[in-house]
């Protein structure tokens, strides 16, 4: 299934060509990741991204891109309608009529070939006798009900065909049934990718997350002696996982941990550094959930800063530049500028559009916290400007910040300032902090030398 690659990124992303009319649109077009994402997605998974682009780009080009994307699938009626729209015609060529008839005939054939085994798998008395041992299950079905390997394989073929027709719910069920019985490891792996895609396209996020784990396990075991194959498959998994990542809240922690794991952060740095945008957005917005486990969040933030710093020469956008400006360069003016640009990028990104407000809110908190740590007396007007707020909004923001974070500070409304009470750090504590830093740097150098 994963091998069902999309048409070239250039062909499809031509529908997202820049038509700049203002700075916001220029920023969105400059940092459009669609050409980067397409090669790592199945063509059916690309379709929602093109749909999202419909409101942003030349509608005719988007329709043409959809046609190029889907013309080799079995979604015959939809493809025919796209052809009519492109050619401004009410009639369609005979080839579409012929293909539709062929698809219907093939569906009928697959339904008949798989009828016996699908009926058996819907029989509770039969299912009750199935065990975790696939070989034993197949032997039981063969001896008791005359099931053959060919019948099992028909489930796989039928599931793939239903997927190509856009019947993703049916495809998920058929591929699941096939996977329960088949001992063909290659086909089982393909069926797992297919079921993963089907669950994504039916927005069945819990089921999709179950498939994430199954695909991950398959990559580790089936491709154990194939590092290049592992790299490619992990890259696919990372990209496909973006769908549940930002649509299913429980997936956020699981996938953030996965992306930061050594094998996957290495894959991101080696093969697809643009994924840092999504990892950064996840970590920043996780600040709003930091009460769950503050130490985990701080570790994620430190890891993110480290990777952004390392990969700055390879990839950057306003989201990663915001991290760099705030935590590497300590440039608050640049951080404010990049936050404004990041907001435009987020609003134009299919995966991140729903996180925009949460990102901006969390980013403002991070700017405030960093700014307050290094200043004793803070001008409210100045800080408001850095947060992109007017003075009244900034004053309310700072009041809420002091209340929510319980920092030791007071507001002098007459002077328009915030006075921070930074307790002096003991010499003992300073030595501990410096020792920690020296120890960490020693570990990094040792690891580098060991390589």
From Swiss-Prot:
It comes from the Eukaryota. GO terms for molecular function: translation initiation factor activity. Residues 256-425 form the PCI domain. It is found in: Cytoplasm. One of its GO terms (cellular component) is eukaryotic 48S preinitiation complex. InterPro entries: eIF3e, eIF3e_N, PCI_dom, WH_DNA-bd_sf. Its main location: cytoplasm. Keywords: Cytoplasm, Initiation factor, Protein biosynthesis. One of its GO terms (biological process) is formation of cytoplasmic translation initiation complex. The keyword Hydrolase does not apply. Component of the eukaryotic translation initiation factor 3 (eIF-3) complex, which is involved in protein synthesis of a specialized repertoire of mRNAs and, together with other initiation factors, stimulates binding of mRNA and methionyl-tRNAi to the 40S ribosome. The eIF-3 complex specifically targets and initiates translation of a subset of mRNAs involved in cell proliferation. Belongs to the eIF-3 subunit E family. Component of the eukaryotic translation initiation factor 3 (eIF-3) complex. This is Eukaryotic translation initiation factor 3 subunit E. The lineage of its organism: Eukaryota, Fungi, Dikarya, Ascomycota, Pezizomycotina.
